[in-house]
Amino acid sequence: MATLLSALGAAASGMDAQAMRLRHLSENIANADTPGYQRKISTFRIGDDGVALGPVRLDDRAAARVHDPGHPLADASGHYDGSNVDLVLELADAREAQRSYEANLRIFDQARQMSQSLFDLIRR
């Protein structure tokens, strides 16, 4: 029984971590056109209760230089720092996070069904 509860806990923590990862990815996508925005990178750590979201890092890649002389942030040459968000990468990461979430959900559901079957057997 403890193993089933561990599986439930691990799957639930995995779903929580992937949900937070999706949140950070959606923030990156929403701010892709925000000047000076740095992409957030989610990290994970293994804890006693399963997986958890680790510290969020900022991507240190250089931001794209955008030429727009009329922009309020433009320097004398008409350039300003855009964001370092790559939408293709963010969408691929979001798809991966969604699939990881769904896999954890299936594990959670299977463990729940197994524990329910065990309880039904004990009641007989």
Which ranges hold each PLM region?
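Amphipathic alpha-helical polymerization modules
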Residues: 1-124
